[in-house]
Amino acid sequence: MKKRNRAAMLVLAVSMVTTPIALLHPLSSYAYDGKSSLEPIQLPADIVHLLTELKEDYVPLMKDLHVDSYGGTSKSGYVINLSDRKSVITTNTTLNISTNAEGDMTQFVLHDVNRDKTTKINKKEAYQKAVDFIRNYIAVDHVISPQATLSLDRASELDHLAVVSVYPQLNNTWVDKETARVMVDSKGQVVGFQQDKVKLPTPAEVADPSKAVPLEKAMKEWQDKVSMELVYDESAGKLVYLPEQLPTIDALSGEEVQSVYKTTSETMKIKGTADMGVWRDTKKMEQMLEKDFGLKLNQRTYKNVKEDKKYKNSDIDRHEWNASSYQSAWITLDRKSKAPIEFKLDGPVEKELEKPLTHDEAKDIAVQFVEKYLLSKEQSFSVKETSLVENLPGWADQNLVRPISSFAFHPEIDGIPTKRPLFYMEVDAKKGNVVLVQVNDLPSMPATITKDGIVKDEKAKDAYVKEANLRLAYWYPKVGTHSAKLPQLAYLPTADAKSLQIDAATGAVEETWLEWKASH
């Protein structure tokens, strides 16, 4: 938030009407909570300026909003809540803004149930809008991602949004740890902003960037290790080559950093017997949770957010069974079709397994879930499996690392997998069961795919490595959500390098959307 004079106060009138009114530029301000009389809302002048700026430059939808409530001080920071609410129960759009004691905006969340999720996002324009927002409202020294990524997170209602991330610097070197992000919708409107305080080590605690090996040496090692995979790009309807593995290079030694994960791929024909009606019936979902996951539902509080007015016109339903001490369950469904979007168990179990599952046992459990609850026909998949290596590095706290095996089920056509998986699953070896399921909405696939006339993978790799670049960074090694306390100096592929793919028919290098995922 730009620094302004906070001494001036502007009193905005409060009206107990049930339709929006234009009292003072830029926004009408009234509170509706069912009471017969309310005191005037007083907003500091800099908050009024902030709201004016946002409406004029970034959020045109604010012209239809009014201030519902406001609190805080210049010493503690402010919280401002706006909406288009015309009565206690009718709300389509809400906007929540928070600032800190320094006067900087820390959070901005626009929730519009009628947001357009079909119009194609203009990647360049969305990026420029986000960059302009960042330069106006983030005062600290930072590095802006060179391109926007695409959020597809339906479970959090963050799908179909362009995301531009912000990173800190240390020793004039990029730190690969997101400190802020801006989200832009298909209309070029800013709908989300989050800024977090990231504690960085002192310059003396990390490696000196001047000690890094030359970029050319790192590039040679990296290029030798890169491999390409032929996949079917379901959104473009064609075959492409993607970088299958993007290694990290230790900047002090010039050698590849060994991964903490083992990855394999297996073709599997799965005979699904799922009765998809389970997702349409709350009682059947509860039977599943009790029988297959051992949840004691009489010890949990059920909530259907469909009944929450915030989600009144949403395109999702979320069923929650919340527990204060042990695992909570959340099931997110498409509101119209009742198809599952996400299944999640979070929190400790009452008793973990004395002997953790092996990776093969975890795979069996994942496949059984697909057969029983997600797939109602026979289908071939390329299953990409990830598990932890046996001997984790010293920075990994064994008490904090969860033994997670993940499985991405990519539909396979004539031996070629799709670019995105249909199902993604995680199994916790100590809990002994599935803890996360995500279902993607993929377009219809062709019955057959021919590889006739496509370029060879060697040619595709040559084309890719000629365009891909590395950058020096402080990189935090991670295992799941657990990361090292101190970053490692490393050469990482740039965002541009990660977004490249090769058209298998022509050998041309193409830029595509990278998918954004929350880091925690």
Stretches with model-predicted labels:
Residues K2-H520:
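Long, terminal "pre-/pro-" and other extracytoplasmic accessory regions
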